[in-house]
Amino acid sequence: MRVWIDADACPKAAKDLIVKFALKRKFEVVMVAGQAVAKPAFAIVRLIVVPSGMDAADDYIVEHAVPGELVICSDVPLADRLVKKGVAALDPRGREFDERNMGDRLAARNLFTELREQGQVGGGQAAYGEREKQAFANALDRIIARLSKG
């Protein structure tokens, strides 16, 4: 069992939860980033820094993740590529990406990108608080249990 993290955009609290689960359940964590990020000092965690470039970390994850593994990412187009490949994908707020919701998630992402570019909406997501952490922990637990059963 392996969990991949799109580490550039993943909140520290979510990364910490993943490592805690990994230590308890004995699975590998691979953090992929386009720049150096803090890596927890445990042997089960690897950090891969890819050459900077548009979607370089995403491309690396898609190329190396396989069905039966989980990727933690906020990037909807990345999640779409993973789901099409049969790889489980979860955002740090506890929302799983799957074939049933991918179309809606992509449409919403594209709409908000367009509105942001037109200056009609600002900023990004709301703060990452206790509610988000709990939703993420619950979803992570559920998906890891499902993937571990094979």
Curated annotation (Swiss-Prot):
Lineage top rank: taxon: Bacteria
InterPro entries, A to Z: UPF0178
Family label: Belongs to the UPF0178 family.
PANTHER family: UPF0178 PROTEIN YAII (PTHR35146:SF1)
Record's protein name: UPF0178 protein PP_5221
